Amino acid sequence: MKAHHCSLGRGRATVGALTVLTALLLAACGGSGGGSTGSGPAASTAAGPVTPSSVATITVRSPAFAAGAAIPVRFSCRGSNTPIPLTWTGVPAGAAGVALIMDDPDAPSGTFTHWVVFNLPATSRGIVNGRLPAGAAQAQNGRGQASYTGPCPPSGTHHYRFTVYAEPEQLSLQAGAPLTAALAAIKASPLSSGRLTGLFASG
């Protein structure tokens, strides 16, 4: 009888071990995620962190013309060559300054830069009558002049782009900085940007 009881005990132990092993195998298969459509913690971890899909853009406008419309003659070489008035909104809170580049991508010899302004205060909302706030400065344009030069296409209708950049820090540039250095610094790592485009035809 004693031997019979030992045999029975061993049988129960074997069944118990098989039950535990089966449970472990089922748990392992369920946690692998293969073909699973659940949305538990394992699925969330695999998805990774959520990142913004795009950076907010700055809205640029001019009281002188609408986006895609003709730029008035008075702002060109055929007029008084007055700097075009601009306004903008949407500069992010973390910006330390604002920069502006006006250029013509249709110029015969490649993009021609008409105007470069940098280190405008982050709180600035535009440029009116060409007046720059304290601290702001101009870099050289395509003519080598640290000033505005208006639209003056040799032939046809050209696009003139006014791009505003929100900068993470004040740029280490001097007034009258060379054009290539200024463009590189402005475009290096802006927080956001926005653009207004106008048209001007040769006379």
Could you tell me what each predicted segment is?
Residues 10-11:
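Twin-arginine (Tat) signal peptide motif
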Residues 2-6, 16-203:
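N-terminus-centered regions that define maturation/targeting leaders and the start
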